[in-house]
Amino acid sequence: MTRRLRSSKFWLLNRALLVVISISLAGVALAQTAQKRPHAGTEEEPVFQDYRGVKLGWVADEVRKKLGNPANKSDEQDYYEFSDKEKCSVYYDKATRQVTAISVDFIGAGTGVITPQQVFGAEIEAKSDGSKSRLVRYPKAGYWVSYSRTAGDNPIISVTMQKLPQ
């Protein structure tokens, strides 16, 4: 009975299907390897280099002098509320007190809200649900920048810049 199945058309069809699937998977893997990874990082200068004049590497005293008194402060993080629509967290290295990350949140659309053009110098393609996101690493500058915008009429936009690990 087993011999009949092996010599049958079913067995040949099964083997042919396995070969086709194997070739297809190999082709997909090769195509993905050969494709240039979009937004994986570039060697160009980042467009978004500071927030309200504050840069990564600054010490806490410089930040507070530039941005004013934070709503909440600690050795590791300052939290600022500039308005109902704009909030910012500045993160510090506990040992050096230098800025390691800046994260800004905007609530709602309209004037004063940061755009992808201001962050990356170009528009970001929207996803099917209307949201947008992008992360770019800048190894020469020593940090990465991300932009995230939720879908809808009252979006939340988050922009973060953070030092790359050394």
At which residue positions do the language-model features occur?
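A generic, residue-level signal for flexible/boundary positions that often mark functional hotspots
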Residues: 24, 48-50
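Compositionally biased regions
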Residues: 8-9, 23-25, 75, 159
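Bacterial N-terminal signal peptides
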Residues: 14-26
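N-terminal secretory signal peptides that target proteins for export/translocation
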Residues: 1-11
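Boundary at the C-terminal end of the N-terminal hydrophobic targeting segment
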Residues: 29-33
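A cross-family detector of function-defining hotspots
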Residues: 36-44, 48, 55-166
